[in-house]
Amino acid sequence: YSKEIPGERVQLDVMKVRNGAYQFTAIDDCTRLRTIRVYPNKKAESTIHFLGEILNTFPFPVQRIQTDWGTEFFNYDFQYELHDHFIKFRPIKPRTPHLNGKVERSQQTDKTEFWNLIDLSDKTLDLNVMAMEWQEFYNKKRPHSSLNGKTPMQKLKSVKHLVPIQPDVSEKFWESNEEILPRNYKYLKFIKHRNKK
């Protein structure tokens, strides 16, 4: 199952490449277009900076960000940044990584087709530059069986006519009355429901 519209849902995840190197990955559910960057940590500042990289890379408005329950996604600064860009925050259920399957699978591809070819013990390498080169190859030259042999850029070209304009995305965001979610938001939801009785 895939979304039909580019930017309708973007899956995010973070994986450790080595000590002091974390790969942030964003993959568009529809086109499989990706943004990857390497940061020295997975703190709020890195997550917010990565969101800017996503918005600069993807040539379409991002409507929803889907993540796991990592603390890097559940900080208020990151969620306020999402609000500032009219992006809905959609965390998956706890302990269900398969719901973020596209980003998880793409990170496995990174491990086998990219990181395994690099001497990660060499601290002089600029892993971020190398990851960006890999991203370019992945998006423009690497065919994907899930896209019937197309690259993510070829898929994007075939569905570009479906991409909404930013004012429409912004209007839908405000209609949805999005809230900032604390990490224990399910408990808060339970309390609110109980107090209504």
Each language-model region and where it sits:
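Short catalytic-loop micro-motif centered on adjacent basic/acidic residues
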Residues: 37, 63-68
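Basic, flexible linker segments flanking DNA-binding modules
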Residues: 1-9, 96-97, 151-160
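Short, surface-exposed connector motifs at secondary-structure boundaries
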Residues: 31-33, 59-64
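Short small-residue beta-strand/loop micro-motif enriched in glycine and branched aliphatics
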Residues: 33-37, 91-92, 116-117
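RNase H-like two-metal-ion nuclease catalytic core shared by retroviral integrases
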Residues: 67-69, 75-82, 89-113, 125-128, ...
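Mobile-element integrase/transposase regions
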Residues: 1-27, 33, 46-49, 175-192
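C-terminal domain-tail junction helix/linker
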Residues: 87, 109-197
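Active-site beta-loop-alpha junctions of metal-dependent nucleic acid enzymes
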Residues: 36-60
